[in-house]
Amino acid sequence: MKQTPLNARHRALGARMVEFGGWDMPVQYAGIIAEHKATREGAGLFDISHMARFWVTGPDSERFIQLIDTFDISKTAIGQSDYGIMCYEDGGIVDDIFTYHLGPDEWMVVANAGNAEKDWAWLNQHTAGYDVVLTDRSQELAMIALQGPKAESLLAPLTDADVVNLAFHGITKATVEGAAGYISRTGYTGEDGFELFLPAGEIERIWDRLLEVGATPIGLGARDSLRFEPGLALYGHEIERDINPYEAKLGWVVKLDKGPFIGSEALHDIKANGPVRTLVGLEMTGRGIARQGYPVVALDGSELGVVTTGMPSPSLGKNLAYALVKAGSLKIGAEVDVLIREKPVRATVVKTPFYKARYKK
């Protein structure tokens, strides 16, 4: 298994370690609920060095990203970033990505850990005819996230960057406690916060300092519940090879009017005809937790779809789930059954997202 530069720190903190996307990662320290609440109420510190960091440089860098990304990054100014999706020709999802505009002809693409090799190959497959250089800097630069309402006040004294006035989705060159890299106002929790891209050799020291000033270490368990409540998609759950952005309620990142890109023809047809499936929120009213893969059926037993993610919500105190179901089959307030070990357990369709994100915009 691969290890991040913070592996020894996680073990010293008593983290429970698990395999995730080929990496040895902390799933929890004090406990998932405590870590979840620490992030919602204070500042959570996450090791996300397992994610991929690819540089795209050269005269055709913007044109190349326009080819592989559903979003229109021609409007992404230097010092800004945007969320987007890479699609196959049929509209299925390769991965969701963040693209950061670092400078003239210089971009960083951040992709999911479990998809890193596939994404790297995908990018390299499509460079023909484009004057670009792709560089994988995932080993060289570590990546940590500081998230929550107290993130700004903890980080500001430790950096020369003006993080107080850094825009939502903004990115800036920064020095943190003497380590030079980048800070972005991005995250995966539904809270205000930052992601730090710093030299791997310096990251243990920065991690220790952030804990010293009051951040709480957070594992992958709480990272999942924190992203789940505000409805942030996770590859392998809400998005996947056989799911398209419109089904995943991510049509807002598909900019068909920007010109051709990989998958644009198929996505144009899907939008015109309407998606076959759609993502809905469920609140369990019967006793039980809906887990990924559990069937969702109508009260007469007919198949509707499948749960993508389900868990008890630490913020709301309810058992909630997202499910991919036949489009048009369910309205808010409708009752369905989730088959938990083949036993029907009642659930109600509810509005999403479950939790309103509290970004600083």
From Swiss-Prot:
GO terms for molecular function: aminomethyltransferase activity; transaminase activity. Keywords: Aminotransferase, Transferase. It catalyses: N(6)-[(R)-S(8)-aminomethyldihydrolipoyl]-L-lysyl-[protein] + (6S)-5,6,7,8-tetrahydrofolate = N(6)-[(R)-dihydrolipoyl]-L-lysyl-[protein] + (6R)-5,10-methylene-5,6,7,8-tetrahydrofolate + NH4(+). It comes from the Bacteria. InterPro entries: GCS_T (IPR006223), GCS_T_bac (IPR022903), GCST_C (IPR013977), GCV_T_N (IPR006222), GcvT/YgfZ/DmdA (IPR028896), GcvT/YgfZ_C (IPR029043), TrmE/GcvT_dom1 (IPR027266). One of its GO terms (biological process) is glycine decarboxylation via glycine cleavage system. Belongs to the GcvT family. The glycine cleavage system catalyzes the degradation of glycine. This is Aminomethyltransferase. It comes from Herpetosiphon aurantiacus (strain ATCC 23779 / DSM 785 / 114-95). The gene is gcvT.
